[in-house]
């Protein structure tokens, strides 16, 4: 059996982690033969809840779970971690936009970036989930200057999965048949779920739907606003679906995307698709051998261009308000 992989998870006492940790320990993320060590971080106020999560993980008797470390110190949680999943953040409540969380959560991710810079493995894969995820990814990255930008990504996989699901329901097709979906931009209501390149069995989804009104007036706003609708229905933000998206994101990043397909990942812009450098932006990427590359050469229509730029403009506004948190 392989040596254990160390996985740090922040916000370990929270809702998303409660849906995530047991799946990681069961092998859903790294496979049925890969042992893991969970290094769990949360704030001291979460104490008894985190103790309860620890007891439940122990009581599952997972064969792959070699050890569990519980701490309130990011230096301990991130020490020699191979994977760091940064879930912990102040949650978004009813009527609250992600931009309202920028200041509070920005401080959290600055501290965690500095800790990662000191103690995480140099080839670690670091996924930022806590909102606003794109800008928090940049804050974390900028406060870990000894690590490569290739180490970091922000999660747009939940948005990507939501888009796949809407198309699958519309066309009464299995989700697994849909390829080449993209969600451009920010993990916020300005994101642009883009069907123009999506395919089912080598047929263009847009040609199968034949309803641009549905695309513009139903599909796009449904995906953009799904998080807020879930909060309205549950009284809490998406948890199980977010945990599932984390599993999907990390599995594809580590083991590679399937042939003739790509995924959406928030990564540092390199100027592709006329998105200026310096922001974490949702791009279509392919993953291979543990790395990722932006898919190049896709045609961007005027309709799409407008929406790509709207998302970029929002990200620059977010950055303007947290510049003091960047190194």
Curated annotation (Swiss-Prot):
Record: residues binding NAD(+): 11-17, 105, 112, 129-131
Any GO BP: malate metabolic process
Keywords: NAD, Oxidoreductase, Tricarboxylic acid cycle
Keyword Transcription regulation included in the entry's annotation: no
Keyword Protein biosynthesis: no
Family that this chain belongs to: Belongs to the LDH/MDH superfamily. MDH type 2 family.
Catalytic activity as recorded in UniProt: (S)-malate + NAD(+) = oxaloacetate + NADH + H(+)
A GO term, aspect molecular function: L-malate dehydrogenase (NAD+) activity
Protein name, entry field: Malate dehydrogenase
The enzyme's E.C. designation: 1.1.1.37
Gene from which this protein is expressed: mdh
Originating organism: Nitrosomonas europaea (strain ATCC 19718 / CIP 103999 / KCTC 2705 / NBRC 14298)
Domain of life: Bacteria
NCBIfam families found in the cross-reference section: MalateDH-SF1 (TIGR01759), PRK05442.1 (NF003916)
């Amino acid at each position: 059996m392989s040596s254990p992989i160390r996985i740090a998870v922040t916000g370990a006492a929270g809702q998303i982690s409660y849906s995530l940790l047991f799946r990681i320990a069961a092998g859903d993320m790294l496979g049925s033969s890969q042992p893991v060590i969970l290094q769990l971080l949360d704030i001291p106020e979460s104490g008894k809840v985190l103790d309860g999560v620890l007891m439940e993980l122990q009581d599952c008797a997972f064969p792959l779970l070699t050890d569990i470390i519980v701490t309130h110190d990011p230096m301990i949680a991130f020490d020699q971690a191979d994977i760091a999943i940064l879930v912990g953040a102040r949650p978004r409540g009813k009527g609250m936009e992600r931009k309202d969380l920028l200041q509070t959560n920005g401080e959290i991710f600055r501290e965690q970036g500095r800790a990662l810079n000191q103690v995480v493995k140099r080839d670690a894969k670091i996924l930022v989930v806590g909102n606003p995820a794109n800008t928090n990814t940049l804050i974390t990255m900028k406060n870990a200057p000894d690590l490569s930008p290739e180490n970091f990504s922000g999660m747009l996989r939940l948005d990507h999965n939501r888009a796949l699901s809407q198309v699958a329901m519309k066309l009464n097709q299995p989700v697994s048949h849909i390829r080449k979906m993209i969600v451009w931009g920010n993990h916020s209501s300005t994101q642009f779920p883009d069907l123009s390149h999506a395919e089912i069995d080598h047929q263009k989804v847009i040609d199968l739907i034949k309803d641009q009104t549905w695309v513009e007036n139903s599909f796009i706003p449904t995906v953009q606003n799904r998080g807020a609708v879930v909060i309205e229905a549950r009284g809490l933000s998406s948890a199980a679906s977010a945990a599932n998206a984390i599993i999907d994101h990390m599995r594809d990043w580590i083991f590679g995307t399937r042939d003739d397909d790509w995924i959406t990942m928030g990564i540092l812009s390199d100027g592709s698709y006329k998105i200026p450098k310096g922001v974490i932006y949702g791009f279509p990427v392919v993953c291979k051998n543990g790395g990722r590359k932006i898919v190049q050469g896709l045609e961007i229509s005027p309709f799409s261009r407008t929406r790509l730029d709207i998302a970029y403009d929002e990200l620059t506004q977010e950055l303007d308000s947290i510049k003091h948190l960047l190194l």
